[in-house]
Amino acid sequence: MGDVALIIKVMPESPEVNRETIVATIKEKFPRVQDIREEPIGFGLVAIKVALVVPDAEGQTETIEATLNAIDGVERAEIVESTLV
């Protein structure tokens, strides 16, 4: 099996949440992070878009979403794109 590239949109709980802490935690939990960008949503809220490469294994995406959703300050995380690498 190969690898899968994922684009994940991580929404903080509020504009006051420290995004740098969330980004640091993501990098700690997922060493194969390729890119992290911020995307303004509105009213001061900024989403974090993460490009991540993971092994192509069954149940992998659900595990990743659950791990990201468990980070303090994260309201929700969802995979918005995926492709085989």
UniProtKB/Swiss-Prot annotation:
Alphabetized UniProt keyword annotations: Elongation factor, Protein biosynthesis
Coiled coil residues, start to end: none
SMART domains named among the record's database cross-references: EF1_GNE
GO molecular function, one term: translation elongation factor activity
One Pfam entry name: EF1_GNE
UniProt key word Membrane: no
Top-level lineage group: Archaea
InterPro entries, per the entry: eEF-1beta-like_sf, EF1B_bsu/dsu_GNE, Transl_elong_EF1B/ribsomal_bS6, Transl_elong_EF1B_B_arc
Protein family (similarity comment): Belongs to the EF-1-beta/EF-1-delta family.
Its biological purpose: Promotes the exchange of GDP for GTP in EF-1-alpha/GDP, thus allowing the regeneration of EF-1-alpha/GTP that could then be used to form the ternary complex EF-1-alpha/GTP/AAtRNA.
Protein name, per record: Elongation factor 1-beta
